[in-house]
Amino acid sequence: ARKKDTDVIALWPSLNGGTVLSADNQTFSTANVHAAISRAKANNFGNQLYIIHHPNAVAELSKASATTADTAAAAGLTNGWSVDLLQNFYSGLRPINGVSIFEDGNIGKISTTDSGYGVIADKTAMAALNSVDTRTERQRDASLRATEVVMTADYGVFELDDSRGAAFRAEIGDLSFS
């Protein structure tokens, strides 16, 4: 699952011809999130928008926000999302302008900076195609005196409609305790 996740994340900076919203040293603030949402709506990204970003970026937003809730049900996960599948990734923030925000801890830092690429997109921007579902096999390795668990899957991830999303750059470094 992590491999598939990182394959999808790697496509985000290419969305919309490489358009990146925000920049290095910019926090995932309410103002920046509103700017990204308004840009997405003004440029016809679609009607089922979502944002995915690193938990540290989302924490920065929730720290400054008075609209937090503790569960997907309490926060009202936007209609059309499968709560049972996504509640563990849902940030718990009430949707901002109707846009749900999800967290993904697999988003990595961009080279030597503390920022990372999240995404704002419509549900029709990207697709995953599975030709073989995940299979788990056990393989005995006598030299290690162990049994390895091998997982395989055959899938592809790709941009379905490039114009329906854009990368969203923000700081993802650890928050301070002060």
Task: Briefly describe each language-model feature range.
Residues 7-22, 53-63, 94, 100-105:
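Internal, well-folded beta-alpha domain core
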Residues 21, 29-39, 57, 63, ...:
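Aromatic-enriched hydrophobic runs in primary sequence
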Residues 64-178:
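Sequence/fold signature of self-assembling virion shell proteins
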